[in-house]
Amino acid sequence: MINDILEPGLRVVFCGINPGKSSAHTGFHFAHPGNRFWKVIHLAGFTDRQLKPEEERHLLDTRCGITKLVERPTVQANEVDVKELHEGGRNLIKKIEDFQPDALAVLGKKAYEQAFSQRGVKWGKQKLKIGKTEIWVLPNPSGLNRASLDKLVEAYRELDDALVARGR
């Protein structure tokens, strides 16, 4: 099992879909060498250097956290079924209510739509909130996602810029 990186007072909690096999094996989030998460959050301004997966706890120093919708590891996120995502959405709401970060960034549009029973979702800030927590939907940084590094960084930077503009 991969532990959440959470505490009260965070700027943002990044929510992946579920652990891949590399992450399950190492015990660290976004551990597959092809996953661009650590590079993207650095280039977008969330961290002052590119962290390694085994340094994930240092995210708390930057007031960032990580969780996931589904605990079960798979080779690909499309192996997670809708029932698991619905349950994961309910569990995620409880976590966010407990920790109340400024923003929740769900990494994947389809996963967000299924977990929160939403349709026609656009990238970026959502109308739906969890208490005071804004919800953002950002592209998944998996190497299987065809989005370019520049597009990923641009999407994540939009969130960072919005938080900075709010003094967060």
Curated annotation (Swiss-Prot):
Predominant location: cytoplasm
CC terms in the record's Gene Ontology section: cytoplasm
CDD domains to which the protein is assigned, alphabetical: UDG-F2_TDG_MUG (cd10028)
Entries under Pfam families matching the protein: UDG (PF03167)
GO molecular function list: DNA binding; pyrimidine-specific mismatch base pair DNA N-glycosylase activity; uracil DNA N-glycosylase activity
InterPro entries, per the entry: MUG/TDG, MUG_bact, Uracil-DNA_glycosylase-like, Uracil-DNA_glycosylase-like_sf
Top EC class, one word: hydrolase
UniProt keyword DNA repair, yes or no: yes
Subcellular location: Cytoplasm
GO annotation terms (biological process): base-excision repair, AP site formation
Entry keyword Cytoplasm: yes
Source organism, top-level taxon: Bacteria
EC number annotated for this UniProt entry: 3.2.2.28
Keywords: Cytoplasm, DNA damage, DNA excision, DNA repair, DNA-binding, Hydrolase
Catalyzed chemical reaction(s): Specifically hydrolyzes mismatched double-stranded DNA and polynucleotides, releasing free uracil
Similarity comment text for this entry: Belongs to the uracil-DNA glycosylase (UDG) superfamily. TDG/mug family.
HAMAP family, per database record: MUG
Record's function text: Excises ethenocytosine and uracil, which can arise by alkylation or deamination of cytosine, respectively, from the corresponding mispairs with guanine in ds-DNA. It is capable of hydrolyzing the carbon-nitrogen bond between the sugar-phosphate backbone of the DNA and the mispaired base. The complementary strand guanine functions in substrate recognition. Required for DNA damage lesion repair in stationary-phase cells.
Quaternary structure (record): Binds DNA as a monomer.
Protein name: G/U mismatch-specific DNA glycosylase
Native source species: Cronobacter sakazakii (strain ATCC BAA-894)
Lineage, broadest ranks: Bacteria, Pseudomonadati, Pseudomonadota, Gammaproteobacteria, Enterobacterales
Gene: mug
